[in-house]
Amino acid sequence: MEIENEQICTCIAQILHLLNSLIITFLDDDKTETGQSFVYIDGFLVKKHNNQHTIVNFETYKNKMKVSDRRKFEKANFDEFESALNNKNDLVHCPSITLFESIPTEVRSFYEDEKSGLIKVVKFRTGAMDRKRSFEKIVVSVMVGKNVQKFLTFVEDEPDFQGGPIPSKYLIPKKINLMVYTLFQVHTLKFNRKDYDTLSLFYLNRGYYNELSFRVLERCYEIASARPNDSSTMRTFTDFVSGTPIVRGLQKSTIRKYGYNLAPYMFLLLHVDELSIFSAYQASLPGEKKVDTERLKRDLCPRKPTEIKYFSQICNDMMNKKDRLGDILHIILRACALNFGAGPRGGAGDEEDRSITNEEPIIPSVDEHGLKVCKLRSPNTPRRLRKTLDAVKALLVSSCACTARDLDIFDDNNGVAMWKWIKILYHEVAQETALKDSYRITLVPSSDGVSVCGKLFNREYVRGFYFACKAQFDNLWEELNDCFYMPTVVDIASLILRNREVLFREPKRGIDEYLENDSFLQMIPVKYREIVLPKLRRDTNKMTAALKNKVTVAIDELTVPLMWMIHFAVGYPYRYPELQLLAFAGPQRNVYVDDTTRRIQLYTDYNKNGSSEPRLKTLDGLTSDYVFYFVTVLRQMQICALGNSYDAFNHDPWMDVVGFEDPDQVTNRDISRIVLYSYMFLNTAKGCLVEYATFRQYMRELPKNAPQKLNFREMRQGLIALGRHCVGSRFETDLYESATSELMANHSVQTGRNIYGVDSFSLTSVSGTTATLLQERASERWIQWLGLESDYHCSFSSTRNAEDVVAGEAASSDHHQKISRVTRKRPREPKSTNDILVAGQKLFGSSFEFRDLHQLRLCHEIYMADTPSVAVQAPPGYGKTELFHLPLIALASKGDVKYVSFLFVPYTVLLANCMIRLSRCGCLNVAPVRNFIEEGCDGVTDLYVGIYDDLASTNFTDRIAAWENIVECTFRTNNVKLGYLIVDEFHNFETEVYRQSQFGGITNLDFDAFEKAIFLSGTAPEAVADAALQRIGLTGLAKKSMDINELKRSEDLSRGLSSYPTRMFNLIKEKSEVPLGHVHKIWKKVESQPEEALKLLLALFEIEPESKAIVVASTTNEVEELACSWRKYFRVVWIHGKLGAAEKVSRTKEFVTDGSMRVLIGTKLVTEGIDIKQLMMVIMLDNRLNIIELIQGVGRLRDGGLCYLLSRKNSWAARNRKGELPPIKEGCITEQVREFYGLESKKGKKGQHVGCCGSRTDLSADTVELIERMDRLAEKQATASMSIVALPSSFQESNSSDRCRKYCSSDEDSDTCIHGSANASTNATTNSSTNATTTASTNVRTSATTTASINVRTSATTTESTNSSTNATTTASTNVRTSATTTASINVRTSATTTESTNSNTSATTTESTDSNTSATTTESTDSNTSATTTASTNSSTNATTTASTNSSTNATTTESTNASAKEDANKDGNAEDNRFHPVTDINKESYKRKGSQMVLLERKKLKAQFPNTSENMNVLQFLGFRSDEIKHLFLYGIDVYFCPEGVFTQYGLCKGCQKMFELCVCWAGQKVSYRRMAWEALAVERMLRNDEEYKEYLEDIEPYHGDPVGYLKYFSVKRGEIYSQIQRNYAWYLAITRRRETISVLDSTRGKQGSQVFRMSGRQIKELYYKVWSNLRESKTEVLQYFLNWDEKKCREEWEAKDDTVFVEALEKVGVFQRLRSMTSAGLQGPQYVKLQFSRHHRQLRSRYELSLGMHLRDQLALGVTPSKVPHWTAFLSMLIGLFCNKTFRQKLEYLLEQISEVWLLPHWLDLANVEVLAADNTRVPLYMLMVAVHKELDSDDVPDGRFDILLCRDSSREVGE
């Protein structure tokens, strides 16, 4: 029997072997490789090339095959291919699974065409509605013909839908996971084809459902967390005994990850009625509760406040299994085992899952290029499944807690059955996870390490990783050091951390009492904290928004390497949440400094709840220094850069908000500030802690030399193994030491009892000191083994003592005794006399010359000589400022040494003026000295400016005393030195008796620390100067007087500046000229000083409207009274000593810079140092002025002018106060000045009077002319007995109306402008005395004047007949006295408006000629309508009296009545004398007109000051504050009126400059850039910052300003700073490319390399493609702009045959290109002519550059070996760029692929960007526009696999990357 059985088995085996051979033969016949290139698979011919398989057409390729292959395939059956070829649908079904397994698949979108009913593929030309209806399929592409492509999709043969759901083979994994089948039974979850169509909605809108799930969970959690405290708890896998609260505290990032994990299951819930897996629920009986999915979809929309009440009720019903709702939750929980594709990235553990399981989905992943997955993957891994269940539990607990009365359903003992089942599922999954997490770890003694899952992990691995992170930290630090003087890590460690004077003794967590709101920063003395902050470098601009952003980004980036350094330095690893929550302050603080070892110690908890005892881990010295540096320096820099308005962080439950009475009222700004001052590792850009996704990126690249990289979990297990096996114990208590190591690694010793032989151990089982000691020993062992201390060299003997660093501050005693220093000979930097000349050219231009030889020699003396102290006396207006300004600029140009100088002035009002003057042209960085006193030297400022009080302050003295030590610590160099100490008007030290007590502190200043001291004054003779210098502690003047020509260098400077006599240079004596001779000085005794002063001011402003004046009053009360009474006449600024310092500075600056301010009123403090160009008059009302104050006041008139000293008659009895100089005396002012300066007296001699006592011989021509004009005006006023009140009228009227003619008139609006201006200028003065100019103007501009004059004297009937049809008699008489031109003007245009203007401008001469030559008929007519008196006067004789009567009666009132009713006579209501009005009466009767004119004038001056026009090239970018080099590349060329949409700033019939009525015109004479043009450019700037939709909304928002460009400019200027910052931020990349020419490399664009073949092409290939495209366009005569706009290949032969630009544009307009462009694209947001005018002269520079490059293109074609073809001419090239600019689809893809560029919204910027060069894949340079054309071609190419790119998916991916 046994033999028979064996024979039977042998026969069966032979049969099976034979069958197997037959099957193999059959398969070989069906799938036969017939050659090296082709394969036959199921009716298709597949071509193999480079391991790529492609379906081809046999008929096309048969001639390319071998003869034997062709014979074999001729017999093959290609019916399947023929079927696909003949199918009209783009999507063709294919049942061959072998084909889909052999050929790469892709995902494409398809839609059903409504017209034909065919299935078509989605292309870029597909409409939006078809896209919305599209669906995705996994397909294989087939080229069935030339440019004909079909797509095969797998469909099984005749599926039987009646037999039930189709088992999904995509859910059967290759590696069986028993748990998901036995516990979750995933094999029973079967989906039919309808289900897959429904599930495709989820993949198409995954982002939406991610957001929906997150919002729902967030809302539920907020409501659940607000419930009153509930005592119920639930047991967890990690805390199975005591349990945790049911509603656990979750971070917002955790809620977001949970929400993303829940997205597929939320989708299932919302579609329970459609999916077949819920068949049990769908079979519910009538009356049972159903889920209203439509209501759920409405309530849970993430775009609005989420309403979760109904959702909460559904969740409660599912938990309680009401009706059949429990079946829904049951299915959803089982579906958790399914992998619905790529979930949220960035969670801790994702990478471990991929590494551990090595799972591969059945369907090849097509998610690598950002494409959506439309099929389910293999089941979830245990770890991912556990995370999903975590999310489900959180959602169920939170949602049920929203409406449930209590949470008993979640009770461990009495809870509902559903919850118990969930707990069982979770526990089983957790146990499975523990099994999966077991790592294969083996010891590798040879390499001093271990093997983790076959990957070597040893000390070299850790050290390589650590020092790579340290190098990354240092590199980022260097970037900051380029902009700042950054202290090094060693500097800060030596100065503070290692300094034993700084104590860090404080209680710590787990050892002593815990203190809230503590930080080790509070333990650092303030004097150290002030000097650790870095200072800006000299070559760096001020803290701009771009620089602040650079600081925050750099510090965010270096946070991650620091985290890794800590991770490796502690040795016993952290879980990521523990590392993430390290805090150096606040209630969750866990970072401390050990006072003994000066190392950083970390106290962290085992889990997030902090339920276990803290673990102590000590860092090594090197890492401690870096952590300390990060907290004390870098974080403080980051806080300063972010500013007080930073509010990116939101309140999160994990965050303890302390210090607020009501935490619910805490704003995001408060939260952000708490976080910045507490937590270490932040992502300030996103407003969150550093995410795991960012942290783990380093694992993929580091260490560089490791062949295999470990993931985070493997690395954690490897660190634990290293601690166990490689780091040995050296103590007697080995058991405790080993157990401590396990606890520090966050392991429970209970889990290792088999290893250690103990059942339990915790640090509470030993004393607190022992616990600390054990943990410190464990850290010490790790540090010693890793060897970080051997790389850390901290030589305390070589580092400076902290006492030396702050010696200056410590040495300052209560008595402020001066610090004695050892003076030395100062090192000299190479200087040249040419430096001063270069500095002058920088400041004043290339034509700079010195005033005289004295000024040149003094500048050289100050700059070149070794004289330590110099005093200069020069007359006011000489240019004393330039004596130190030019040397300061020369010092600043020295790159090897940084000089910091100080300037002090006597009064606060001089600060603003000095800073404006000294900072012009950007030659010096100037700042207030207060900044230096409060913050120290910033490393950028060249000159600090302050007042005498600052010079005398203790803080300033102390900072100067400690200068060298602090600078060496802060800037790590000795090349930052103190430069000049400059004191202006130093005579005040002696003359200001009442302030001498304030100057006492100056004597404590260490003058020896400065390079040189310079003392300047215009009123300091030798006696005053010597006394002033001695009063501040200096030696005084040199005993031997020095001449300016003596430029000997002192050889011995060892005594120091303070003990060296000051050398005096007295330019007044040298020149022997009396100062102030250029000013006309007048002494007047008057009855009323204010009244006389007002007369003088009004007269000055009538003559010189743009001039300014200063009035010096005697008391503060008088200052305020004058300001109140004069402000109705002109704009006034007043200042006196009772105002605050800031207010004084602000008002002085306003007067100097605001051109509309006329008068500065103040006490004598306004007489010193102020330089005002328009100043023409100084009036002094102070009776107590001494000679110094007089000279200083008159000295403000730099270029000449008038000075009036007004005193009351018989009241000059002022006495000098004790110790002060006596007041000036009555008499010759020049002689008193000579006496003061010690000049030779000329009393009684020739030349005694210089600019005084009526002498004009030494005055300038302009000053003499001004005096004469003032005298003439005074005589005129005296003759007419004019009142003071009337004086401003002419001045105001001329400004408001007469000037309008100069700049408001235009050709099309000339008549209206003339008439309006004529009416406005009607007044008594004009009529009473008509000058020749007016008459000529009237006769030339319009000859209707004469006619209207006749009509005034004629009845209404006559006037009408004349206007409508002038009879022969009247016309003849008129033409006799009027030229032919006048007659023509009358006959052609006679209107009411003309009559008005004529009536008001009739001259006496015209009236006489008209009256004497009017025909008898007319005279009779006139007589009949004229009063007897007038008739007699007129008819009897035309004499002067009659003329005067006629002229005087022509006034505003008469004109109005004449125009209203022509029947009324001009002199009807009285005789001529009664109608003669005085000018004052006339103005008073027209108060409304005068007020209106005043308002226009005031508005005009305000606008002129606010929007100055300095040149014709002025643009709005200058107004925003951009530098010239930035404006060059952001310049808004091509922006004109056509840029504005129709109706925006385009009104007609108004002033072209301001779009206002001509009588309200606010334009000013000489304005070079109109307000309307500035408004166009401002609108363009707003367009720069907005996309199309945002710009549309913006145009709607500014609709009130569409007709008011001036109002819009005001609205725009309010956001000036914000707009500037936004442009700097949004266009930083653009400026980097266009201005700094940073290179764009396609290889740096990851998305480009993955998503486009163009980015993998060489430069040669791109150029060939570019030339090929243009060759094709030229051959086909395709319309270029339309083609690049939307790939429409319309013909336009005229475009290619056009000879010039005009014909070219006409051709485009003829075919309707511009019209289509406006209707289809964003070009509709501009004017109708905007695009058309781009072909004119807007882009001349770019055109010239392009035409010069045509030769280069020809050479390129020859080099490429292609036939030279014509490259496009300029107009075609510009058409291409405009088309690409308006092609939204193309631009979206280009911006997605080319990561170095972003969006631009202005065509000029696009054109500039297109012409930059990029590096192709082979590092050859090509213009960007060639790359653009290649990408454009790829988008239109169906034969490029990656050519068709879904823009919606592009944007989703970019948003995901951004998040």
Curated annotation (Swiss-Prot):
InterPro entries: DEAD/DEAH_box_helicase_dom, Helicase_ATP-bd, Helicase_C-like, ORC1-binding_dom, P-loop_NTPase, Sir1_ORC-binding, Y'_ATP-dependent_helicase. Residues 861-1038 form the Helicase ATP-binding domain. The keyword Transcription regulation does not apply. Residues 1095-1244 form the Helicase C-terminal domain. Keywords: ATP-binding, Helicase, Hydrolase, Isomerase, Nucleotide-binding, Repeat. One of its GO terms (biological process) is telomere maintenance via recombination. It holds the Pfam family Helicase_C. Residues 1318-1461 have a biased composition (Low complexity). Gene3D superfamilies: P-loop containing nucleotide triphosphate hydrolases (3.40.50.300). Induction: Induced in absence of telomerase TLC1. Residues 1462-1485 have a biased composition (Basic and acidic residues). ATP binds at A874, P875, P876, G877, Y878, G879, K880, T881. SMART domains: DEXDc (SM00487), HELICc (SM00490). It is an enzyme of class 5 (isomerase). Residues 1318-1485 are annotated as: Disordered. Catalyzes DNA unwinding and is involved in telomerase-independent telomere maintenance. Belongs to the helicase family. Yeast subtelomeric Y' repeat subfamily. PANTHER family: PTHR31583, PTHR31583:SF2. This is Y' element ATP-dependent helicase protein 1 copy 3.
